[in-house]
Amino acid sequence: AQFVKRGYSQVEPNHLSAQRTGQIYAQLPAKSDIEVLENGQFVKYDYVNKEVNFTGKGEWMMVFNEVKTYRDRETYEDFAMIKQNYNARVYSPVGQSNSDLEHVMDYSKAAFREGSSEGFTWDIPKLSYPQNMADGTTMVPRVIKTNVGDIYTTNGVDETSLQEGDELAPNEKGFLNKASAASAGAGDMKWIVVKVYTLADNQPAVKLQRIA
């Protein structure tokens, strides 16, 4: 995104309805060829193909991961979801059938709670868990649905300059730009620039409102 001068795209949630409606999704892995996902980037939540990508059907969803930084000098600009930092591989906590797990885990022995002489054994039903994630997928982003009227501030726009009233829409890489808004069809997502100013770290940013 050209508005980003340092680090990665950021999001300041001024008024995002997903925080009230619960339209937050984090069950599908990013497609294997996606190396980086930045907050404020838009993706398709492609449930048919069991992946997050840029080409699926349906509405654009906004990437809005929890910012995790681990050094004192790091700020929001230093965070993005980078594939090499993640190693998820299964859709569930187990990822395989319990009959398979019996070969490596012994549930037959009694366990004892602290301070108790009465033992108990695990009653594990023979349930099959979902299959492993697709080859090459390792990260599962958190995405949110936006609605008309939503407002947020970001530098995740693929433009060098903007002014109030400019309309934006996601391009093929999920970043907002004017060209995509100009070619958008009826019913497609659109955002309008309501204010041009800066983020807390003094990088250029825009406040946006969804209008379609």
What is the role of each PLM region?
Residues 1-212:
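Surface-exposed, low-hydrophobicity beta-strand/loop segments enriched in small/polar/acidic residues
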